UniProtKB/Swiss-Prot annotation:
Cofactor note: Binds 1 Mn(2+) or Fe(3+) ion per subunit.
EC number: 1.15.1.1
Gene this chain is encoded by: sodA
Subunit relationships: Homodimer.
Family membership noted in the UniProt record: Belongs to the iron/manganese superoxide dismutase family.
Function as written in the Swiss-Prot or TrEMBL entry: Destroys superoxide anion radicals which are normally produced within the cells and which are toxic to biological systems. Catalyzes the dismutation of superoxide anion radicals into O2 and H2O2 by successive reduction and oxidation of the transition metal ion at the active site.
Any one GO molecular-function label of the UniProt entry: metal ion binding
Gene source species: Staphylococcus haemolyticus (strain JCSC1435)
Ranges in a coiled coil: none
Protein name in UniProt: Superoxide dismutase [Mn/Fe]
Catalysed reactions, as listed in the record: 2 superoxide + 2 H(+) = H2O2 + O2
Positions contributing to Mn(2+) binding: H27, H81, D161, H165
Pfam families: Sod_Fe_C (PF02777), Sod_Fe_N (PF00081)
Cellular component aspect of the GO annotation: cytoplasm
Alphabetically ordered keywords of this record: Iron, Manganese, Metal-binding, Oxidoreductase, Stress response
Length: 199
């Protein structure tokens, strides 16, 4: 079965002023859609068509060599963005088991946000910043391009796209401003759900 572009769980202008409508439209309808199209083209006629995108990305080493790069880039792009849309909401509320765990590990939510923001800002070129669960502990990691922590056996529960296409229309070269705005639209309920599913 072909992979499909998921619908956004909110209107394209729902995250204004933090993430603008035009960026959301281009990011979802054009960029994400292209990843889906190219992923389907790469896996057509292979047994990967019947697997979930999570399973494929978690086992990239077993993907045939001739399509591995295309699947890594476009499969990662599809998985990362599918998760990203769900991790955003116009009704952000900082609560839940995961928030308590963050405070326990970092001392405060602000300390966590600072480390996450620093790592996201320092990610050279295109990539992602993630909060992952690794052996029961929370960890902040970054990945290049469309790589996903699942490939390294870590479970992502929060992710931030730091490709320029995610913010350039509104923030231009001011990536730290975009990262700061991100905290206003984090769907902590979804982060909590993903965290609890790892237990």
């Amino acid at each position: 079965m072909a992979f499909e572009l998921p619908n956004l769980p909110y209107a394209t202008d729902a995250l204004e002023p933090h993430i603008d409508k035009q960026t959301m439209e281009i990011h979802h309808d054009k960029h994400h859609n292209t990843y889906v199209t190219k992923l389907n083209s790469a896996v057509e006629g292979t047994d990967l068509e019947s697997k979930s995108i999570e399973e494929i990305v978690a086992n990239l080493d077993s993907v045939p060599e001739d399509i591995q790069t295309a699947v890594r880039n476009n499969g990662g792009g599809h998985l990362n963005h599918s998760l990203f849309w769900e991790l955003l909401t116009p009704n952000s509320e900082e609560k839940g088991t995961v928030v308590d765990k963050i405070k326990e590990q970092w001392g405060s939510l602000d300390e966590f946000k600072k480390e996450f923001a620093d790592k996201a800002a320092a990610r050279f070129g295109s990539g992602w910043a993630w909060l992952v669960v690794n052996n029961g502990q929370l960890e902040i990691v970054t990945t290049p391009n469309q790589d996903n922590p699942l490939t390294e056996g870590k479970t992502p529960i929060l992710g931030l796209d730091v490709w320029e296409h995610a913010y350039y229309l509104k923030y231009q070269n001011k990536r730290p401003d975009y990262i700061s705005a991100f905290w206003n639209v984090v769907n902590w309920e979804k982060v909590d759900e993903l965290y609890n599913a790892t237990k």
